[in-house]
């Protein structure tokens, strides 16, 4: 399905079924946010490994993945950098979406006003 291969960081206890993989990083060696970004980077690769016809991703495939493992301090620096950049990108996208919404609303109003005769069309 569409959600196959998606990643998330959960900060609460959850119940999951056989269609989810739950990973806990040993913080001495692997920072959880770094692991999150590694899986985000490998999203299309992971989906390609199992193919579109397969319903899920089995632990067999996850065990075969190679995750680059710099020292923990570097992992944290990488994660902090990506957090900052991804947040800035998300904010930029949100700002542009609000602008698009305003133009879309203006376009609808313009069409309505012209079609109903509330606004005169000049030649």
Regions from the language model: what does each represent?
Residues 1-6:
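Short, charged beta-turn/beta-strand-edge "cap" motif at the junction between a beta-strand
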Residues 7-8, 35-41, 81-85, 93-94:
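N-terminal start-of-chain detector that recognizes signal peptides
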Residues 16, 58-61, 85, 107:
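N-terminal alpha-helical segment
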Residues 69-123:
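Amphipathic alpha-helical coiled-coil/heptad-repeat segments
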């Amino acid at each position: 399905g569409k959600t196959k291969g998606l990643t998330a960081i959960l900060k609460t206890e959850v119940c999951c079924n056989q269609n989810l993989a739950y990973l806990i990083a040993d913080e001495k060696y692997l920072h959880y946010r770094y692991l999150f970004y590694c899986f985000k980077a490998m999203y299309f690769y992971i989906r390609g490994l199992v193919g579109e016809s397969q319903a899920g991703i089995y632990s067999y495939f996850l065990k075969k993945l190679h995750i680059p493992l710099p020292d923990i301090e570097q992992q944290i620096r990488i994660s902090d950098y990506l957090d900052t950049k991804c947040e800035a990108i998300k904010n930029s996208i949100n700002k542009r979406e609000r602008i698009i919404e305003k133009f879309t609303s203006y376009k609808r109003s313009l069409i309505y006003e012209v079609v109903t005769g509330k606004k005169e069309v000049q030649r």
